[in-house]
Amino acid sequence: VPIYQVSHLAGLFSSFNTDVIGSLDFYKSGFPARYGSKMSSVVDVNTKEGSFNDFHGTFAIGLIDGRFQFEGPLWKGKTSFNVGLRRTWTETLTLPIFAVMNKFNRPDKQNARYAFSDFNAKITHKFSETNRLSANFYTGRDALRYLNDNLHEHYDENNEVISERDVVDIAFSWGNILGSLNWDYEISDRMSVRNIAYYSGSYSSLSFSN
């Protein structure tokens, strides 16, 4: 399933949450025919199946982000789920910086916020060891906002001070949404069938006010 926005924060962070990745294959060239008409390299990322027997997960908090992953059986031995959520809070670092800047530059106020989040979910059902059906969902979003509040003062014809505010507010967001249904069937040790129905799309929006 193709994904169109493959990174967060201009490539500093991957769109893929490592807590839910089962395998990753990189093909620089000579990749298999199943990747169709791709002209460049291919990165094949597979979300791991959840545990069919017990519940467990991970939780981590870092300086700029937090993540959560949980998996387990919906029907023990037959159906499992795996979900992962990740979000940054870089705005908690930028807000104090701009607060200090605005304190020493009182006529003009500036503020900038950036954050990204992504969510993964996978449900797998085993009809048998060689026949399984899985549903995948992924959504990721980046959001950037910049605010510039300027105070202008000038004198009118009566020599009175006139104060005017000029506010620029820019909001930019972009992301992906993906859903797929996969049916995998192993006919023999050397032959298998995979059928995939999917939707994959990207979006972006920009708003500007003055």
Model regions and ranges:
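Short acidic/polar hinge/loop motifs at secondary-structure boundaries
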Residues: 2-27
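Extracellular loop and loop/strand-boundary signature of outer-membrane beta-barrel proteins
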Residues: 8, 54-56, 104-109, 162-169, ...
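Extracytoplasmic
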Residues: 19-21, 38-42, 54-56
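N-terminal secretion/transport leader regions
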Residues: 24-26, 43, 70
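Short beta-strands and strand-coil junctions in structured, solvent-facing domains, enriched
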Residues: 30-33, 67, 90
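Transmembrane beta-strand segments that form the barrel wall of outer-membrane beta-barrel proteins
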Residues: 47-64
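Transmembrane beta-barrel wall of Gram-negative outer-membrane proteins
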Residues: 62-87, 103-147, 171-195, 199
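Outer-membrane beta-barrel translocator domains and adjoining extracellular loop/strand segments
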Residues: 94-100, 140, 146-158, 197-200, ...
